[in-house]
């Protein structure tokens, strides 16, 4: 499938791995195609995941106490560093499995598929809770990561796409976003309605695949190796690593797309229902490296909107998310 953009063509990359190679840490990005970079990153991710699992060859039991409004006091005997909040939900009911978006583990927001590391208390969070703030933030964050995946894959291997960051923005801003730099040959390109529809279609393909959001905490050294070809991610990793003495960085993966994200994120892509890539804005047209802000809107399957309301929300989401809104969120996070 190809989409024309002026004299350029945007083509969805085909499935498949491509040739194998030897990893050379000093190789410039130009030597690896986007498909090869994806392979390399996943190889390193899988290797680190296997290494971490091998550190606990003997199964150790932990006790997890449920403190929710329903079924309070239920205690699960689970496997340390293997069992997840979703594993606990499976012992309760199908309702918990299908409705839970996040867990609170000893009061801390936690991914549903992130392994539990010690005996703890657990509570499950849903979109219908009296205060869904943490759930909404996780949903927005996850939708932005999906947007990054779509944009990175939408351009054929001939064009370099560098993901910069997914700014934390409040839901009330009306759109989530991902900042991106494109190949210099695309500096004059602005997306048509057909391009936006193509991006949206790719996002719905991710939703249809019902992919889990995997999470992996790694040493900054591992994260830097995975993202060695993206200077923006390298800077972001260094920033995050400097914020904790262990220099631990959180990675997430959907399918074969890996990103740096503090999380927590939603359990699966199928939590999303309505999703649209609605706008692209130029952030710094006077600077040498043009940064584009791709924006989108989504509602989960639990909170669907009628078409007329959805259309109004989409129209609102086209307005550029400003740096003031981004800074407002960052300042709020830093004071909590």
UniProtKB/Swiss-Prot annotation:
Main localization, broad class: mitochondrion
One MF term in the entry's GO annotations: structural constituent of ribosome
GO biological-process terms attached to the record: mitochondrial genome maintenance; mitochondrial translation; translation
Keyword Acetylation found: yes
Superkingdom, natural source: Eukaryota
Start and end residues of each TGS domain: 60-126
Cysteines paired by S-S bonds: none
Localization of this protein: Mitochondrion
GO annotation, cellular component aspect: mitochondrial inner membrane; mitochondrial large ribosomal subunit; mitochondrion
N6-acetyllysine sites (modified residues): 123
Keywords: Acetylation, Mitochondrion, Ribonucleoprotein, Ribosomal protein
Assembly and interaction partners: Component of the mitochondrial ribosome large subunit (39S) which comprises a 16S rRNA and about 50 distinct proteins.
Protein family: Belongs to the mitochondrion-specific ribosomal protein mL39 family.
Protein name, per record: Large ribosomal subunit protein mL39
Gene source species: Mus musculus
């Amino acid at each position: 499938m190809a989409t024309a953009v002026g004299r350029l063509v945007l083509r969805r990359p085909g499935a498949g791995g491509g040739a194998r190679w030897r990893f050379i840490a000093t190789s410039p990005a130009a030597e690896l195609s986007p498909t090869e970079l994806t392979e390399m990153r996943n190889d390193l991710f899988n290797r680190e995941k296997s290494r971490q699992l091998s550190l606990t060859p003997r199964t150790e039991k932990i006790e997890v106490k449920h403190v929710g409004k329903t079924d309070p006091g239920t205690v699960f005997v689970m496997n340390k560093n293997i069992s997840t909040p979703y594993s606990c939900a499976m012992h309760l009911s199908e309702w918990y499995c299908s409705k839970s978006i996040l867990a609170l583990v000893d009061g801390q927001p936690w991914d549903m598929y992130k392994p539990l590391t010690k005996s703890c208390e657990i509570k499950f969070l849903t979109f219908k809770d009296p205060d869904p703030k943490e759930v909404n933030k996780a949903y927005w964050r996850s939708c932005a990561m999906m947007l990054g995946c779509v944009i990175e894959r939408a351009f054929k291997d001939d064009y370099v796409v560098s993901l910069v960051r997914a700014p934390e923005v409040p839901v009330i801003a009306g759109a989530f976003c991902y900042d991106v730099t494109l190949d210099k040959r695309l500096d004059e390109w602005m997306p048509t309605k057909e391009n936006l529809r193509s991006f949206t279609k790719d996002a719905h393909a991710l939703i249809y695949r019902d992919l889990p959001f995997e999470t992996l905490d790694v040493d900054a050294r591992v994260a830097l190796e995975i993202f060695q070809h993206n200077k923006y991610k390298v800077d972001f990793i260094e920033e995050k690593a400097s914020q904790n003495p262990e220099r631990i960085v959180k990675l997430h993966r959907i399918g074969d797309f890996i990103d740096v994200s503090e999380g927590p994120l939603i359990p699966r892509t199928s939590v999303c229902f309505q999703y649209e890539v609605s706008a692209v804005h130029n952030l710094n047209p006077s600077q040498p490296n043009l940064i584009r802000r791709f924006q989108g809107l989504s509602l989960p399957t639990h909170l669907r909107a009628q078409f007329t309301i959805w259309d109004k929300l989409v129209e609102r989401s086209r307005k550029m998310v400003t740096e003031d809104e981004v800074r407002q969120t960052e300042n709020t996070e830093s004071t909590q």
